Structure formats: structure tokens, C-alpha cells
């Protein structure tokens, strides 16, 4: 199962491919030659690009940052600091953000936090994750699934998803959760659709939380920590089911055209 950032990137590439010539590569495989051959660069995960590589992009090409996980903070979690104000000593890559033609973020809270910590950055919030129309259709087809189970949690080895903390909550409340870990995306969504509720306890400020949005599109009640959920900062957060699917379809179309 692809993570949220990877799924977003995949859907963006899929949208752009028919419109222009695209070369994609992992950050650790980026070369000067590839930069030189590009007219414009969309930078997503740049964690493995050496500092001199970022400077070269910054100095030679127009570029857009598609921001997923607060790479202007050393620990990649602005929620670790009061009011999301990151100490100067804990900031990184700030010039790279400032010099970008535009920085696309996924939620309003992430726009506010980035602007607060890296002023004069040109930030645009798309207010959503990216899904394909086929995925929206599939989620919609699951709306009438019988809710046979009470509560589900995300089974993930990624520590920021707080799987163990979710298990502790369930144990304390005498709940036997359905654990979502299916590698096939459609199976993952179908299993989620069989539940009444989802528990998700983010360990950091989630830039959006794709899985939380999917739970609400499927009509589940979401138990979470809203202050650490990018999705919760959006004015469609209280929607669910078909209404939320419709809102996300519209936002996805607008987001893709913005690129």
C-alpha cells in the first residue's frame, strides 16, 4: 500500500503526463544532467538530494515544491513547538522554500504554519489529497457496505502513525479493533468501509491525512486529534459520505489545474 505522499505524487504525474513531457526520478538519483535538461522542476521528496544539489536547482531552474512533510523543520514536525513556531536553530532549507516559484501544500493549517515560519514564501493550499476519479467511484460504490465492525485502526510500522498508542486506547476501552494493513488499496478501503468508526492518533502535524479523509468519505465516525490533522483545518471537515466525495472531486480538479 502506497503512503499518502507517494499516492499524491502518483496521481499528479498521471494528470500531467498527457499534457507535457515528464521525467520522474527518486531524489537520490537526481543528477545535474537531468536538472539541465528540464524546463521546470516539481520537487516533492528532496530528502536525499545533497545541499549542493538543492542550491543548483535554486540557482538554475524555475521550480515548484509539492510539500508533504515539513522539510523546513529538522524534525519535520512543527507541532513539537508552542503555537507551531519553530526556533530558528531548528529550521532547514528555508532559502529553498523562499526561492520556489510556488509551494503547494495540502491544507490551510500547513499554509499558515509555513508562512509563519518561512515568511515571503509563495504558498498555495490545494485543500486536499489527490485521488483518481476511479478511486472516487470505488469509494462511492462502498457507501452501502454493511457496517459489520465497530472500530478500525491503521496498522503501520511508521512511528508517527501511532499504531501502538491506538492499540493502548483500544485495550483501555475494551475494544477489539479491526487492523487495517491490506497491501492492495481496494481491499484496504473495503475493509475500512465495514467499520462504524476509525481511530487515528497522529504523532505529528499531519499535512492532510489521506486515511482520515478516506474514512470520512466512507461514512465512518473519525476519532482523532484535530489540532494535528491538516484535513481538520478545512471547511469541509464536517462533511462525510457522498457530500465529502463530491467536495473532494471538485477540489481535486481545481488542484490539478493549479499545477
Predicted regions and their residues:
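Active-site proximal beta-strand in glycosyltransferases
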Residues: 40-42, 58-87
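Membrane-proximal helix-turn-helix segments that form the acceptor-binding/catalytic region
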Residues: 82-103, 112, 193
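A short, active-site helix/loop in glycosyltransferases that binds the activated sugar's phosphate group
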Residues: 98-122, 162
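Conserved catalytic-core segment of nucleotide-activated headgroup transferases in glycan assembly
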Residues: 130-188
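Short alpha-helical segment that forms part of, or immediately flanks, the ligand-binding pocket
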Residues: 189, 212-218
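A short alpha->beta transition loop at the rim of the catalytic pocket in nucleotide-sugar-dependent
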Residues: 196, 219
